[in-house]
């Protein structure tokens, strides 16, 4: 019994010593394990990019009317196929700044003439500073597929148009996260542009 009691009494100081050493090591090692810079790199990059680009309101004033014009020239009541949502602007806090992203729905339509589509895109968007490129590839389901991309780094806008041999074409655009210039009461309200939502371009659910 005495030996067991002595062992228990001897174990207590050892346990206390171990806890003390662990706490000391944790405190001493903390400076050597700072917050990794990778965790903050996205926020820094997003704010820097947004500072070099125009505002979300400027996109609605200067760019989106032409995007809708292009869309409505490519898509009409006779070749419209499917639209699953409406345009919207989302917001995200980054540090002490709110950034906004405009996203259009992907609209499906019937078309297989990639050259005609590219000509329409170039004629309207190249004068606004967009760079347009096209890439072709062979797919199993749709045959030849042409992806037409138009990018404007000043406004942070990217337009994607897919034209497929199967006649399943699609159109959509979105922005990078952008700052607000304060010119509107609600930066998340999409710009009021004529023909943004034609009566025939109804929302349809996926089949």
Stretch-by-stretch model annotation:
Residues 72-82, 128-130:
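Short secondary-structure junctions
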Residues 77-103:
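A glycine-rich, hydrophobic loop/mini-helix early in the fold
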Residues 25-28:
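C-terminal motif of bacterial Sec signal peptides marking the signal peptidase cleavage site
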Residues 30-72, 120, 126, 134-207:
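An acidic-aromatic pocket/loop used at catalytic or ligand-binding sites
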Residues 97-135:
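Mid-length scaffold segments of soluble, non-membrane domains
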Residues 2-3, 93-95, 129:
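Well-ordered, non-transmembrane segments within structured domains
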Residues 3-18:
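Bacterial N-terminal signal peptides that target proteins for export
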């Amino acid at each position: 019994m005495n030996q067991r009691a002595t062992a228990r009494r001897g174990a207590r100081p050892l346990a206390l010593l171990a806890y003390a050493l662990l706490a000391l090591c944790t405190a001493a090692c903390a400076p050597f394990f700072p917050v990794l810079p990778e965790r903050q790199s996205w926020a820094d990059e997003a704010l820097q990019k947004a500072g070099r680009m125009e505002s979300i309101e400027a996109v609605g004033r200067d760019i989106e009317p032409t995007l809708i014009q292009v869309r409505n020239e490519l898509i009409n009541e006779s070749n419209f196929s499917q639209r699953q949502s409406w345009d919207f602007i989302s917001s995200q806090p980054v540090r002490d700044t709110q950034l906004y992203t405009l996203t259009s729905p992907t609209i499906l339509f019937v078309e297989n003439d990639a050259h005609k589509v590219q000509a329409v895109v170039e004629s309207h968007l190249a004068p606004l500073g967009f760079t347009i490129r096209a890439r072709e590839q062979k797919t199993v389901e749709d045959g030849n597929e042409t992806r037409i991309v138009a990018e404007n780094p000043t406004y942070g806008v990217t337009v994607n148009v897919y034209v497929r041999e199967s006649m399943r074409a699609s159109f959509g655009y979105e922005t990078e996260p952008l700052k607000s210039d304060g010119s509107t009461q609600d930066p998340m309200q999409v710009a009021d542009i004529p023909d943004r939502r034609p009566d025939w371009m109804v929302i349809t659910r996926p089949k």
